[in-house]
Amino acid sequence: MSATEKRRYEVLRAIVADYIASQEPVGSKSLLERHKLNVSSATIRNDMSVLESDGFIVQEHASSGRVPTERGYRLFVDSIHDIKPLSLAERRAILGFLEGGVDLEDVLRRSVQLLSQLTHQAAVVQLPTLKTARVKHCEVVPLSPMRLLLVLITDTGRVDQRNVELEEPLAAEEVNVLRDLLNGALGEKTLTAASDALEELAQQAPTDIRDAMRRCCDVLVNTLVDQPSDRLILAGTSNLTRLSRETSASLPMVLEALEEQVVMLKLLSNVTDLDQVRVHIGGENEDIELRSATVITTGYGSQGSALGGLGVVGPTYMDYSGTISKVSAVAKYVGRVLAGE
């Protein structure tokens, strides 16, 4: 990169920083006043003209300054080398808050609450998918003579419950046999790999519990194996209401994408790397609902394996360095808590 190119990048960086702080078009005079660029106003104006020609900034009105384009934000983000570190107090607060979680879902709920507060954006986390989870235990609880509760516990800490209606009541000993057979068939298997075992078990169970076993297996296969219920936890969607006038028109589409979850589930399901933070700016998002927003995501998990994705959704003029740092930190601390460190 030549000296001229370096200077122009510094001008772009200053424009992005000022626009993020104010959401107001940035002019050459304010750049010289706020930043030590050590060049003349004529040079700044020339650099801004070149940056505009190259598509990194745009002048929205003839009498106004410039604002960054999505291409300008992308160059800015790709050039970030010094991610803002969290203070010791922030790190202790994050870990202490997450360690107060009573189970996996509570830890994840706390993580998005914390992330939305730290970044002032909407935060989202994907609960571990059942598709890759392994069964640790299947509890069978009689709710009434004609109804059972199946409680499935996976190695990710996720707990799912389903009711099973019976044709005939089961004795306590029969419930115990049914429980043991289910755990024998499901133990340490992924739910996708358990389907064949459950179908075989339904056919080979002892005659006196075969109908009950068939009903239990049907419920597990139909609702947990064939149609695993991936879910999201959201926090801080109200933060999006502070969007600038230029982007507030797209707010309903962004909120709809968050609330209906399908778009975000698809995006987070592709997050498999624990060490990489991904930044999708505006039109880089595949789904039209998010093309006016920036989405920053990473994976969380333990022992080198990702259990799901988490991240934030906000305007394209967000504090990229600080937000990337906080998304990464919260994900790492979630992993530490899940690993019991």
From Swiss-Prot:
GO terms for molecular function: DNA binding. The keyword Repressor applies. Keywords: Repressor, Stress response, Transcription, Transcription regulation. Negative regulator of class I heat shock genes (grpE-dnaK-dnaJ and groELS operons). Prevents heat-shock induction of these operons. Belongs to the HrcA family. InterPro entries: GAF-like_dom_sf, HrcA, HrcA_C, WH-like_DNA-bd_sf, WH_DNA-bd_sf, WHTH_transcript_rep_HrcA_IDD. This is Heat-inducible transcription repressor HrcA. GO terms for biological process: negative regulation of DNA-templated transcription. PANTHER family: HEAT-INDUCIBLE TRANSCRIPTION REPRESSOR HRCA. Pfam families: HrcA. The gene is hrcA.
